Design a protein with these regions (language model features):
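Short proline/glycine- and basic residue-enriched helix-capping loop/turn segments at helix->loop/beta transitions
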Residues: 28-64, 88-135
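A short acidic/small-residue loop/turn micro-motif
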Residues: 78-83
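Residue-level structural signal for beta-strand termini and adjacent loop
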Residues: 76-77, 113
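Bacterial N-terminal signal peptides that target proteins for export
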Residues: 1-11
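C-terminal motif of bacterial Sec signal peptides marking the signal peptidase cleavage site
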Residues: 16-19
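Bacterial signal peptide processing site
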Residues: 21-24
Length: 137
């Protein structure tokens, strides 16, 4: 009785595999998508004239990160109101590096918005005194 049960079970399994589309060939697994990740994002150079004047702001940039993980397009999405801060933000982001997002195991470009904050220093930088002397002198 047991051999007959095993034979019937094996036959049912084979029929079930064929019915489910199992042909014995394996299908390559689909790679899970990954998201864009920042790798190297050094801060921007703060324009000394604005730092000395205590002027800050936020420049929000629209950045296209290419498949190599580097910014390929950088534009100002929302200005800080200070062109020098916006330009400093653009220059900084131009040198940033990312790990590109992937879809189906392949890197893809992605567009993101990046806020770059400029907060004036608590204490006046030493360079400010040199600028003051140049202006007076």
């Amino acid at each position: 009785m047991k051999p007959l049960f095993l034979l019937a079970s094996s036959s049912l399994l084979a029929v079930a595999l064929v019915a489910c589309g199992g042909s014995g060939t394996s299908v390559a697994p689909v790679a899970a998508p990954t998201e864009l990740a920042a790798v190297h994002t050094p801060p921007p150079d703060y324009p000394i004239e604005l730092a000395c004047a205590g002027i800050g702001g936020v420049s929000t940039l629209k950045v296209v990160v290419g498949i190599e993980g580097i910014p390929t397009e950088i534009g100002v999405f929302k200005s800080s109101g200070q062109p020098a801060l916006d330009e400093a933000a653009r220059k900084a982001v131009h040198g940033w590096q990312f790990k590109a997002a992937t879809r189906n195991g392949q890197p893809v470009s992605q567009t993101i918005q990046v806020p770059v904050n400029f907060t004036p220093p608590q204490e006046r930088p030493n360079q400010c005194f040199a600028l003051d002397s140049q202006r007076q002198g």
